[in-house]
Amino acid sequence: MKTIVLKLGGELVHAPELDVIARDLRVLVDGFNRVAIVHGGGPQASALQKTLGLETRMVAGRRYTDAQTLEVMKYVVAGQLNVDLCGRLLANGVMGVGLHGASGHVVQARRRPPRVMKGAGPEPVDLGLVGDVLGFNLPLLGDLFERRYVPVIACLGCDAQGQALNINGDTVASQLAGALEADALVLVTSTPGVLRDVNDPSSRIPHITHAEFERMVADGTISGGMIPKLEESFAVLDSGAKSVVIVGKLGEGDLAHAVLNPGSAGTVLVG
């Protein structure tokens, strides 16, 4: 029995590839593996903000979250996308249970204080209503796993006073993988892994070390949203998870293949 945390980017929730992923998940769950999904919703949130005439402000790949932006995230991520994702899973025989930070306090968080961020200069950055993960309701997740349900967790945390906080989905997935001591954290993105040239899918890097990551940030090869994604992913290797794999859109059977044959698909992070 393996424990797998799967992170889905918001752009995949309504993509045809999700049905392929869902069928692979059914195989994994039927094999008595424990699977949890964490999903974001950045593209949909940005689209709704544009429709509403609200500015989308990003700092070093992170979304600045004021009160209006948080309401958008609640509506899009914890609402529409979580429901739609659970529905697509159900249609493919997977029993997903939609959750967010306030659901049984499954994602326990506190508001992040200003801090210096890689790629954002030397001054501390205040990201607004953004949270840092403190922990998870592991007994609740354990009960769901035991009954072969798949927790589907929106990337919103909640503090002890009930205040919802926006949290980067990769952060939630990475820290959940560490807390569960997962056999694999799989990040499914719109690109086939970490690329030397973002315009060339064939430039996929099969394996990347932390030292190589630092060099690529310094020379600009890795930038934007990939920086926090990889930072959190490297950190999870020190917190209990056994492996991290970043993959693109998957074909039938590719999910298990990516986990069981590291480097055959996507990019595997090594210490």
Curated annotation (Swiss-Prot):
Site positions for Transition state stabilizer: K7, K229
Catalytic activity: N-acetyl-L-glutamate + ATP = N-acetyl-L-glutamyl 5-phosphate + ADP
Binding site residues for substrate: G41, G42, R63, N166
Gene3D superfamilies: Acetylglutamate kinase-like
Keywords recorded for this protein, A-Z: Amino-acid biosynthesis, Arginine biosynthesis, ATP-binding, Cytoplasm, Kinase, Nucleotide-binding, Transferase
Primary location: cytoplasm
Compartments reported by the entry: Cytoplasm
Xref: InterPro entries: AceGlu_kinase-like_sf, AcgluKinase_fam, ArgB, Asp/Glu/Uridylate_kinase
Domain of life (superkingdom): Bacteria
Listed pathway(s): Amino-acid biosynthesis; L-arginine biosynthesis; N(2)-acetyl-L-ornithine from L-glutamate: step 2/4
A Gene Ontology biological process term: L-arginine biosynthetic process
Enzyme class per UniProt: transferase
GO CC term, one of those recorded: cytoplasm
Family annotation (Pfam families): AA_kinase (PF00696)
A GO term, aspect molecular function: acetylglutamate kinase activity
EC numbers for this chain: 2.7.2.8
Purpose of the protein: Catalyzes the ATP-dependent phosphorylation of N-acetyl-L-glutamate.
Protein family: Belongs to the acetylglutamate kinase family. ArgB subfamily.
NCBIfam families reported for this sequence: argB
Listed name of the protein: Acetylglutamate kinase
Protein source organism: Anaeromyxobacter sp. (strain Fw109-5)
Organism phylogeny: Bacteria, Pseudomonadati, Myxococcota, Myxococcia, Myxococcales
